[in-house]
Design a protein with these regions (language model features):
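Conserved PLP-anchoring active-site segment centered on the Schiff-base-forming lysine
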Residues: 81-137, 161
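Phosphate-binding glycine-rich loop
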Residues: 47-94, 108-110, 118-120, 142-152, ...
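Active-site phosphate-binding strand-loop segment of PLP-dependent enzymes
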Residues: 124-222, 227-229, 234, 374
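N-terminal "arm"/small-domain region of PLP-dependent enzymes with the aminotransferase-like
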Residues: 1-47, 375-376
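Helix C-cap/helix->beta junction micro-motif
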Residues: 112, 181-182, 336
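PLP-dependent aminotransferase class I/II
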Residues: 11, 55-59, 67-68, 120, ...
């Protein structure tokens, strides 16, 4: 086919008519009731933690993700850390997570005092490979006094954290099956997957717990924010308590029963989030339309994900031949004002995680990270804005 960089430029500058100016990778679209809701916060001075918009945002997320409980936090990293802590993860534990993910996944594990154990990826989904998880648990872990431990480190295996990469759902059925055999809880890192569905069910609500991110570059933003999702009432209570300074006093008393965190989302941010969630169906329709046009345009090098999943098309991706072609593509597109990016570095290659345990060579993840590029994916691209 034609040089992918040229093909992308012709599509964006030609077909979509974006003749001048930079084209962002993914930018927020502030529309709908955003100004009215934020102004309401300013007019009433309900700008900090607490407030009707926080409660409303939690309710909206619970409905969208088909869970009973949602707890708002200040960002996705704190949401993941709190969800893990709510499940009892802490020092002396290890948590399985993909090597191909954003660094916050591993950082949140470390913030609990636990150690990440990096697992390989699956080519079809880009996410955690359930068979790699099964292999780690069966061949590199054993039960000692009824506790599942990683043999090489002696750490208790406490949880598994898959991440839905770029909004593409992981093979959750197989992963749930593998983890159920070892009674291991799963916390979905759905930071990039609001609106994605796996076999018709919303991502973030498929396991013991899930988390969302509302960073400025996500499909829906609060400026900065996160959400913990669960159907477990006790877990919801624990994480809400933990993220609100563990306060037990009422009224004017200030009693606290453990070392808690001030992870509360401000009402001002939640107001923006409520307006954004009202627009989610439109955002999804436009982004999926764009993804289909990219798929038709790029053919076999476009990353489609699994047939079992319906991505929110947060960040569209191409899978090029090798690192040389990737770097050439990135240089050519960015030089012409079209923002593209590679995937992250493998987290296991970062200096602070160089000695962390892993499932093996991470061959698939390493191959993917050398070939993936993300291309402009904003919903506005098809809205004439």
């Amino acid at each position: 086919m034609t040089n992918p960089a040229v093909t992308l430029e012709m599509f964006l500058r030609g077909k979509l008519g974006i003749a001048q100016g930079p084209i962002a990778l993914h930018e927020p679209w502030i529309t709908g009731n955003a100004w009215a809701y934020v102004k309401d916060c300013l007019d009433t001075a309900w700008v900090s933690t607490g407030g009707a918009y926080v409660t409303r945002l939690e309710s909206m997320c619970a409905d969208i993700c088909n869970v009973a409980f949602a707890v708002a936090t200040v960002n996705g990293t704190t949401a993941l850390r709190a969800a893990l802590q709510g499940l009892g993860v802490g020092p002396g534990d290890t948590v399985l997570c993909p090597a191909l993910t954003f660094v916050a996944t591993a950082n949140a594990i470390v913030h609990t005092g636990a150690v990440p154990l990096f697992v390989d990826s699956e080519l079809g989904t880009l996410g955690m490979d359930p068979e790699a998880v099964s292999d780690v648990l069966s061949s590199r872990c054993n039960f000692a006094d009824g506790v599942l431990r990683h043999a090489a480190t002696g750490l208790r295996v406490a949880a598994v954290v898959p991440m839905h990469v770029f909004g593409n759902p992981v093979d959750m059925d197989r992963l749930l099956e593998v983890c159920a055999a070892y009674d291991l809880p799963i916390v979905e890192d759905a930071a990039e997957a609001l609106g994605s569905r796996y076999k018709g069910f919303p991502c973030g609500g498929l396991a013991k717990a899930g988390i969302l991110s509302f960073n400025g570059n996500k499909i829906v933003t609060t400026g900065g924010g996160g959400m913990i999702l669960t159907n477990d009432a006790e877990l919801a209570h624990r994480v809400r308590h933990l993220t609100t300074t563990a306060r037990v006093g009422k009224g004017w008393t200030f009693d606290h029963d453990q070392v808690g965190y001030n992870d509360r989302m401000p009402n001002l941010n939640a107001a923006l989030g409520c307006a954004q969630l009202e627009e989610l169906p439109r955002f999804l329709a436009l982004k999926r339309n764009l993804a289909q046009q990219y798929a038709d345009l790029f053919g076999s090098i476009f990353v489609r994900g699994s047939n079992a999943g319906e991505s929110n098309a947060w960040l569209n991706a191409l899978l090029l031949n090798d690192a040389t072609e990737r770097d050439s593509f990135l240089e050519d597109t960015n030089a012409k004002g079209i923002q593209t990016r590679p995937a992250w570095r493998l987290i296991s290659d970062l200096p602070m995680y160089a000695t962390a345990p892993r499932s093996g060579s991470l061959a698939v993840a390493r191959d993917l990270v050398e070939r993936i590029v993300n291309i402009p994916s904003s919903a506005q691209l098809l809205a004439g804005l």
